[in-house]
Amino acid sequence: MPKDGSLNRERILDAAEKLVIENGYAATSLDHVLRAAGTSKGAFFHHFGSKLDLARALTDRYVTADITNLDAALDATADVADPAARVVAFVRHFEDRADEIMSGQSSCLYVAVLTERQLADAGTADLINTAITAWRKGIADLLTEAATAGGLELEDVDALADHVFVTFEGAFLLCRSTGSPAHMRAQLGVLRRLLAAALGVAAA
C-alpha cells in the first residue's frame, strides 16, 4: 500500500458508493462503511473529516468518472466523418457497453445523493451540476454540428442534449425498479433510433 494510504481511501469510497446506491445516504452508517471496507475509524478520519465529507468526496469522484466516460465516448467517435452519424455512434458507444455499465452498479449515485436534502444543501448538487453541464455541452456540440451539416433546424438543442442524459438516469431507475439490467441497452437503443430519425441518418 502506498505510504499516503490512497488504496485505503479508495477502498472506503468503493464501499460507501455501493452502500449509498443500494440503501441511501441516511440509511448508511459510518459503521456500515467501515465493516464493508474492512478498515477502522482511525483510518477513516485520516482521510475524511466526517460522513458528510465522505459524501462530498464520493460525489466528486463519481462526477469525475462520469465526465471521463463522456470524454472517452467523444474521443472514440471522433473519427466518424459524418456529424449526424457521429451522434448515432456516440449513443451506440454506450449501448454496446450497457451490460458492462449495469454489471458495475445497480443504479446511479446522482439519484441517491439528490434525494437526500442534507446532501443537496451541502453542495453535492453543485458537483452533480458540473457533470450535467459537461454532458449538455458535449452532446449539444455534436447535435449542433450534425444539424448544421445536414441543413436541419433543431428546435432546442440543449433540451435534446439533456434528454440524452436523462435517458441514462431513467434507464437506471427502470433497471432498479424491475430488477432487470436489460432496460439500459433497450432504452439506449430506442434513443439511438430516435436521434437517427431526427437527423435523417441510418440508425445502424
Where are the model-predicted features located?
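Amphipathic C-terminal alpha-helical segment
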Residues: R97, D141, E145, F165-A182, ...
